[in-house]
Amino acid sequence: IRDRSSHVSLEELVILAEAIITAISKSSGRYPRLVLSSLREFIDNAPYFLGKTACRTALQLVKANVLSPKESKARLVLLRHGLPDAEVNCHVDRAMFDSGKPMSLDIAWKHFKVAVEYDGDHHRTDKHQWRRDRKKRDRLRQLGWTIIVITADDIRDEVACAEFALNVARELTLRGCDVDFHVIAMTVEELARREKAADRKKRRESAV
């Protein structure tokens, strides 16, 4: 991330950081949140390097446990259009496969039972994966979940991204969520500044 920070966009830096966290977590067995914490500490304590400010800005938006770059992209699209933050790859209560393994969702607002699932090509071409996805989604819809399934086409350009975000915003609103939808997406830089301001406000309030 250090080496790339001065050569890629802020969005790409967030996606790269989330991919690194997932890779380290899988290879080492460490919890993703601990890896993220270590990454933040490493960047904060590192001597100055070209791109350090960009790294620290990107880390305002990075989440642990995002399992694919396209999921990272989809999550950022939703945030840039004003949707509330969501949990990533979270387990759903009382929902398990026959093996006993808990069912999880890529991006989810658990309180409102709305979720987004990203399907790469392997979800379509791998019969086992396709059947597994179908079984999971049928089960979760029976439990009252609204599940929006997207592919790479849904986040390919600004128009597609806006339509995707509007669709999710509509479903959240129908479930009682207050959504401040932005037709024109914020830049990733604007989003990072907003997150930083919100974090500062939260810290001030908790200190009182």
Predicted features and spans:
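Surface segments flanking catalytic/ligand-binding clefts of nucleic-acid enzymes
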Residues: 25-208
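Hydrophobic alpha-helical segments and helix pairs
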Residues: 1-36
